[in-house]
From Swiss-Prot:
Subunit: Component of the Integrator complex, composed of core subunits INTS1, INTS2, INTS3, INTS4, INTS5, INTS6, INTS7, INTS8, INTS9/RC74, INTS10, INTS11/CPSF3L, INTS12, INTS13, INTS14 and INTS15. The core complex associates with protein phosphatase 2A subunits PPP2CA and PPP2R1A, to form the Integrator-PP2A (INTAC) complex.
Methyltransferase in keyword set: no
Domain VWFA: 3-227
Membrane-spanning intervals of the chain: none
Motif (Inhibitory loop): 626-633
Gene that this sequence comes from: ints6-b
Organism: Xenopus laevis (African clawed frog)
SUPFAM superfamilies reported for this sequence: vWA-like
UniProt name for this protein: Integrator complex subunit 6-B
Length: 883
């Protein structure tokens, strides 16, 4: 997955205009968009990651990093402005640090254990600048200097700020301000002479001098082709040149002095596996030092390994089943020289200096060889010191039949002593693939010392913290200056040079009274001039000069509407649709809106499931985790069809038994006796004596067909407990098992009165109608006052127990939501429910409904049994009263 980082020059010099009429910054923005369009033609561009860095100070210069998406990248690119200095060196260091942010965490660099070309993160930095002088706060610089100190942990392990899979390319804009008279000839794009060119060469890239729009497009196409997966290596010749050419003659031109192919700084292509899409390798490139187990630290390595090649022709060694790595070299003078020799069957061994323990040049770890078709040069990477190992392995498989004798083991053990310890792991894996897993002892120590491993782990943790900090700081806007500090333009003169110096002396000595000091606000030390805040809209209703000329008529209409409106409404400074108008581009930017809203308060109930943000449809939820809100969805369709219209709203309970209570069926002609509470199954019925007599309510006959819920509510309000005398106290500790004598007496009075289906709100009206029929006006007024007293008493009792029931309901619902099957607390809380029987029955039905929503089957069955026990007790009381 290539990383494409664009470093755009946002200094003030980018505001200059070319002959096309556009500024350099606009040309740079267009170049980035053109590059992305050209890159999108390649199917491999799906995994590209784009980053954007400018010349602003850290962290404001990082516009798009590791977490920002493509939309954020394009938005930040369009909003760039050319202001500030040309701090190109600091911005380049910021770009490299941004790319190296996660390398210690992922372990790509593999410090101290060899360089693995197949562990890479290919990155290309495209810098677009105007090539002007490098200006900083300290002055103008002629050379490009990158800061040596870096806040990134582990930066001391590498000498350079970049890595071997990171390359820098620069587009230096040299477009003239006037149109060229002569037509330019199509030639190769030249290197630029700006200070950034040297930095490009060091990283393995190059610079382009852009003098026209045609050359710019040509450079962009060339850059797209440069996106290759690979690492940069320094190839240097070791030893004498090859003396003989293919025709047997020496080349006098090439034999004199240093040639370009003697030292090349080029890329080797690391091709990804077609099946997995990830490069696969077996052998590392050796380190330039011999690892010491007693060393507490690691020596810093160079970004690009120095690989020496010897011009000695040798036969390429390969044996069966031994894995090797093959990398193609980028075209260079070295590859051209090797191909011109036309010797595809010979190779040149390669070394890494100081990689061996006792040899300065080191032992060969591979070789350079031209392809059979003579169209490219490949680097073959084999085990370290392969000229010794491969013959031993060949003898083991062919002569000893995979059974090593003692005579064979002695040279093999000597080879292991000359091999760097970090090759033990890859060699064990290769021998396992070849069928000899037990050839090397498991007791061999390889790797790094304990102190070095601890040091690398500590650096990895610090790098993770720094990575989170940098990623969190990306996207912050540069703090705007609210004022301009005023500085004195001239230095203050000494008091001795002032014209009134003598008078000042007399004032000091007291000969002359002191004059009041004249304060000049322009010379005040902390004087500042406020700047206009662009985020605050001008209050046009305060200052008429803030109204744009094109909006005068609209503003006049709005002022007239505010004047004619009622004073109760608020004055509006803008239209209603204008307050909610937003560009279409920003309508879907929901994440940006969430960043600016304040953090929500903590939940009052931690056990309550949190509602996730569903942008778009607020009712869009995952069906797997959605709670059933309607009880009908929990019952099968046959049960819904067989539902009777006279039954109560108790849907949603599985295996539902028919309820035998007459209170929950259609209203009978003879009212039933109502009890207060039943504690549970098999509880004895205790009778409490009530000391006061109960007044009998006036019988009212109504022939109306009402639903069961209305009937239950009316029965609740018409309970006999509402007519108890003042000295009767209904305590909170009543259980469902108590059945007072007041209920028995009430049943007799209700039976005598006939139908008891009336509402307490209609009590006064009914009594008034009765008295009107009898013609007794005084009795009418007396009964009306009595009814008003009873209604007031009922309202007071309702307020007393309803508040307690609300608290109990919240506690019970909280217990229902908890996981597990411990429901003892729920039944304990149900005993504390206050109110008459119907209030408690409705409360219990609501609890069953909530248990149905959360699919608490065991709790539903227990609550149903609890409810049936209440109905059974009630029927027993009704039977006794009828007898």
């Amino acid at each position: 997955m290539p990383i494409l980082l664009f470093l755009l020059d946002t200094s003030a010099s980018m505001n200059q205009r070319s002959h096309l009429g556009t500024t350099y910054l606009d040309i740079a923005k267009g170049a980035v968009e053109t590059f992305m369009k050209l890159r999108s033609r390649d199917p491999a561009s799906r995994g590209d990651r784009y980053m954007l860095v400018t010349l602003e100070e850290l962290p404001y210069g990082i516009k798009a990093g590791w977490k920002e998406n493509h939309a954020t990248f394009m938005n930040e690119l369009k909003n760039l402005q050319a202001v500030g200095l040309t701090t190109l060196g600091q911005s380049l260091r910021t770009a490299f640090d941004l790319l190296n942010l996660n390398r210690l965490v992922t372990g790509i660099d593999n410090y101290g254990q060899g360089r693995n070309p197949f562990f890479l993160e290919p990155s290309i930095i495209v810098a677009i600048t105007d090539g002007s002088k490098l200006t900083t706060a300290n002055g103008v610089q002629d050379e490009l200097h990158l800061p040596l100190n870096s806040p990134l942990p582990g930066s001391e392990l590498t000498k350079e700020p970049f890595r071997w899979d990171q390359r820098l390319f620069a587009l230096v804009l040299r477009l003239p301000g006037a149109t060229a008279v002569e037509q330019e000839q199509p030639t190769a794009v030249q290197f630029d002479e700006s200070p950034i060119t040297a930095m490009c060469d060091v990283t393995g890239g190059r610079s382009y001098s852009v003098t026209s729009q045609r050359i710019l497009n040509q450079c962009l196409e060339s850059l797209v082709q440069k996106i290759q997966s690979g690492v940069v290596i320094n190839f240097e010749k070791s030893g004498p040149d090859p003396p003989i050419l293919e025709d047997g003659l020496t080349d006098p031109v090439r034999s004199v002095g240093s040639q370009p192919w003697h030292s090349c700084h080029k890329l080797i292509y690391v091709r990804p596996n077609p099946k997995t899409g990830v490069p696969i390798g077996h052998w590392p490139i050796p380190e330039s030092f011999w690892p010491d187990q007693n060393s507490p630290t690691l020596p810093p390595r160079t970004s690009h390994p120095v690989v020496k090649f010897s011009c000695t022709d040798s036969e390429p060694l390969v044996i069966d089943k031994l894995p090797f790595d093959k990398y193609e070299l980028e075209p260079s003078p070295l590859t051209q020289f090797i191909l011109e020799r036309k010797s595809p069957h010979t190779c040149w061994p390669v070394f890494v200096p100081n990689s061996a323990k006792y040899c300065e040049l080191g032992h060969p770890f591979g070789y350079l060889k031209a392809s059979t078709a003579l169209n490219c040069v490949n680097l073959f990477v084999l085990p370290y010191n392969y000229p010794v190992l491969l013959p031993l392995l060949d003898d083991l498989f062919k002569m000893h039949k995979n059974k090593p004798p003692l005579k064979w083991r002695q040279p093999f053990e000597n080879y292991l002593k000359t091999m760097p310890p970090y090759y033990i792991g890859p060699l064990k894996k290769a021998l396992r693939m070849m069928g000899t897993p037990n050839l090397m002892p498991d007791s061999m120590e390889y790797g790094l010392s304990y102190s070095v491993v601890s040091y690398l782990k500590k650096l990895s943790q610090q790098a993770k913290v720094e990575s989170d900090r940098v990623i969190g700081s990306i996207g912050k806007k540069y703090p705007q200056e609210t004022s301009i500090k005023v500085r004195s333009g001239s230095n203050a003169l000494s008091l001795a040079l002032r014209k009134d110096f003598k008078q000042l002396l007399q004032e000091i000595t007291g000969e002359v009274p002191q004059r009041p000091m004249d304060l000049n606000m322009k010379e005040f030390a902390g004087f500042q001039i406020a700047l206009l805040n662009k985020d605050i809209k001008p209050q046009t209703f305060r200052n008429a000069y803030d109204i744009p000329r094109t909006n005068l008529l609209d503003h006049l209409t709005r002022m007239r509407a505010n004047l004619l409106k009622s004073t109760r409404q608020f004055l509006k400074g803008q239209d209603e649709d204008q307050a909610h108008s937003i560009p279409i581009v920003q309508m879907g930017n929901y994440q940006e809106y969430l960043k600016h809203i304040p953090s929500p308060l903590r939940e009052l109930d931690y056990d309550q499931p949190r509602r996730l943000h569903t942008f778009g449809n607020p009712f869009k939820l995952d069906k797997k985790g959605m709670m059933i809100d309607e009880a009908d969805e929990f019952v099968s369709g046959n049960q819904n069809k067989l539902k009777r219209t006279g039954e109560p709203n108790m849907q949603g309970v599985p295996k539902r038994r028919r309820c035998m209570s007459p209170l929950l069926h259609s209203r009978p002609q003879s009212p039933s006796v109502i009890n207060n509470h039943i504690s549970g199954k098999d509880s004895p019925v205790s009778v409490n004596q009530v000391l006061c007599d109960l007044p009998k309510p006036v019988a009212v006959h109504k022939n109306t067909d009402m639903s069961n819920n209305v009937a239950i509510n009316e029965a609740t309000e018409n309970h006999v407990a509402d007519h108890l005398c003042d000295d009767l106290l209904i305590t909170k500790s009543e259980s469902f098992g108590t059945l007072p004598n007041a209920a028995l007496e009430a049943s007799e009075s209700y039976a005598a009165g006939g139908d008891s289906n009336f509402s307490p709100n209609d009590t006064s009206d009914v009594l008034l109608d009765k008295t009107r029929e009898s013609g007794d006006t005084e009795s009418c007024l007396l009964n009306n006052n009595t009814a008003f007293v009873h209604r007031k008493r009922r309202l007071h009792q309702c307020r007393s127990y309803e508040e307690a029931n609300i608290e109990l309901k919240a506690q019970i619902l909280k217990e229902i939501r908890k996981p597990g099957r411990k429901y003892g607390i729920i039944f304990t809380l149900l005993k504390d429910v206050q109110g008459d029987l119907q209030t408690r029955l409705l409360f219990l039905q609501h609890v069953i409904k909530e248990a149905t929503r959360f699919k608490k089957r065991m709790l539903i069955e227990q609550l149903e049994g609890f409810l049936e026990e209440i109905h059974r007790r009630t029927n027993q009381v009704n039977h006794l009263s009828s007898c």
